[in-house]
């Protein structure tokens, strides 16, 4: 638990459809250890650690957060609840596609699978740019380098979060290219980060796509 954590929040949730928690993430930000998922998030710039695990019988999901205040922990829990798809009802999807000739076998074999999501909109944007038009394994390696070199940590934990938009906006293109990010992608990432960091684009707004 991070050194600045003075508050703890826990919640037990019943997914709307069968859910299998992922086994960590290739970018190294979400980690799995002994059946427990763990990652560092930043809420309003403050570090919060969130953990998730299956409850007894694997029907329920247990979420816990440790951070500077209950309010920040509550926000972090909500973000991970969204990212893990705990409230998604995929029963209609399974009913319609379990016998589909193309994807039916995959649907039947992994009923607890959820679409991959990110708990932070800028994280989703930054990684979408990194993952364009290249192999996913190569993109994940680039993301791990970005997190290792520019990401945020917190005292008391080895977990790391993505860098802020301001940090990426100020990163030299040559540095980003040294992570194996293509030149055009490096420029696009800096430009997108600059728009977010300056406030000209508010990803939390309902009309951010305009």
Would you name each region that the model predicts?
Residues 1-210:
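HhH-family (HhH-GPD) DNA N-glycosylase catalytic core used in base-excision repair
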């Amino acid at each position: 638990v991070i050194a600045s954590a003075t508050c703890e929040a826990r919640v037990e949730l019943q997914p709307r459809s069968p859910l299998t928690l992922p086994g960590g993430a290739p970018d190294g930000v979400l980690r799995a250890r002994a059946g427990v998922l763990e990652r560092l998030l930043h809420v309003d710039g403050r570090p919060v650690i969130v953990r998730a695990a299956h409850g007894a019988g694997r029907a329920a999901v247990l979420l816990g957060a440790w951070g500077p205040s209950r309010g920040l922990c509550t926000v972090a829990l909500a973000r991970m609840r969204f990212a893990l798809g705990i409230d998604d009802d995929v029963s209609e999807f399974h009913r319609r596609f379990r016998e589909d000739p193309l994807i039916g076998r995959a649907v039947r074999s992994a009923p607890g699978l959820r679409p991959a999501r990110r708990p932070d909109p800028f994280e989703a944007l930054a990684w979408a740019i990194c993952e364009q038009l290249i192999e996913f394994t190569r993109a994940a390696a680039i993301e791990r380098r970005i997190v290792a070199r520019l990401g945020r940590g917190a005292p008391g934990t080895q977990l790391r979060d993505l860098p802020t938009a301001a940090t990426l906006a100020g990163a030299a293109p040559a540095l980003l290219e040294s992570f194996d990010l293509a030149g055009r992608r490096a420029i696009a990432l800096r430009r997108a980060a600059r728009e977010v960091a300056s406030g000209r684009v508010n990803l939390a707004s309902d009309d951010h796509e305009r």
